[in-house]
């Protein structure tokens, strides 16, 4: 493999990328492992030109696709997850803010009062609309509502409790998802659970009514953006919203405050013992306002959007977007040899994020057909039989197709993060088996509001971006695996080198970043678990940074 020289410390602005926060259209809808749009744009600008074809075979929420279109490229977004393609299309869709507001007002007229009636609070002969209901171990213990300009927090009355109990899933006259979750303890999913169990019967009833009215909208473009707002608001309407209890001081002593703050649905299907039930209409309206603000700003963007039906139409005409909801292997097989100018992608990282399982809530509400069998993932769900062997086989064929469709001497950027030894070693060997010359290894920081950053000791707090050049004359060299038994000295030398260069010590992940950069370019790699043990045994930790023991003394 050929590689230009780089280090973690020289020219850090080019090798270690700092993320912007998710704002505007990128904050409209949750999706896991979103990559910072500013960094993705930099790569697209560097490795492709206007009107060239950029492909993301695992496009997720479509950040690479939107940035390609915004920078006047032709973009192909592929993802096996229907929700991913749906979100990507809505991110790019230019919607008239006037038409969207009109449609919202129609939904508001038909639904708001009906939904709010499900949350009525009666006090002193007057009716108020409840905003939040606090549950502890499935018992309603607190109700929140507005009384004039005042926010009221009270214990529930008998009438409040009976109203909440009056809702039953068997009595809902509208569609709601009844599918069981896959059993996966990693994401707190139990096969005995249904999708509808993620919601209180009252919120389930309200959501079903809301979606039923949205589905009656005749304009498909408007209907889709309203569905997008619906799924975007769904997490906050679920039972997965936890309570935040702040610590404060009383008489000089630290204690938990009685006042609770509303948390949010983060990742997985964990239902806290103490959780909020939030008024569904408020969830939907709040998300509508956020989407409307982003879409108003997007209206002024100068880009044009013209979606193609297939690769031929995209490549030969003026079309600039092709979205394919299918497996990466079957989608890439439809693309001719040596026909793509740049590929950038962030594939599933082993068992880190089971995308289709996590997206089941959205996919089932929107009645999407999902191909679980061909997902490239390692899942801890025994229901799925998605082990490392299956992952490696599918990833290998995907890389084979990427190699085939990329033009000679053009670039392929591959984003990755894992703390699993076997996943890393297999990936390194796979990448080495194709006609790719490694050009550069860089790190990508997470956005400040990312929910997937691994903060465990030894967790990689940045992703790696490996950029390759397709070289048909590539000479393949076998990857040498450095082990503690045979090559510990080489590993120690590199750790010493990076710590000395840093002067003030490094965090664990920074040392790992340096070792990956230094060894991979020399066709060498290591077991992450062994390196973590070397660091813990041979170095000293001071204020979360590792140093040579003699320096600490």
Language model segments and positions:
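Nucleic-acid modification enzymes, centered on SAM-dependent nucleic-acid methyltransferases
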Residues: 3-54, 71-336, 352-384, 398, ...
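Short acidic, hydrophobic short linear motifs in intrinsically disordered regions
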Residues: 502-515
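Short amphipathic alpha-helical interface segments
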Residues: 495-503
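Charged low-complexity interaction tracts in eukaryotic proteins
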Residues: 479-481, 522-553
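Conserved SAM-binding loop of SAM-dependent methyltransferases across substrates and taxa
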Residues: 63-72
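Class I SAM-dependent methyltransferase "Motif I" SAM/SAH-binding loop
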Residues: 58-62
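Hydrophobic beta-strand segment of the Class I
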Residues: 343-344
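Conserved Class I SAM-dependent methyltransferase catalytic core
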Residues: 213, 378-439
